[in-house]
């Protein structure tokens, strides 16, 4: 889920990176409290689903500007939670959109695309995510099984 402002200090004490940066305001708050370089992933809601977090694709440029202007944040890549659909073409289209955003930002910043990770895909759709360029997948269900009610 999203990182709440009142949890930033706790998060900074126990994480090596933040994968849920979704606004310039949050970037500013994290930067003000960080004491060293902190890799961050911009979370983008490419599915457009109201139940998903992340900035809109149209807001990515402003968020990248905030990260670039910060003293402590280092852009490590992009993250999304996939479309909740059994239709491969739809899920892959959303992942392809995030890859396209990453590629545009890499070109704008003058870095290699491979310098910016893509964190996308979970146990149910990891093959589709990898096919679309994922470099990080989240495999909780595959490792630990279904959540208990």
List where the protein language model places each region.
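Active-site-proximal glycine-rich helix-loop-beta segment
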Residues: 133-135, 140
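Short C-terminal tail/terminal secondary-structure segment
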Residues: 139, 145-149
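Conserved alpha/beta-domain cores
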Residues: 1-126, 130-132, 144-146
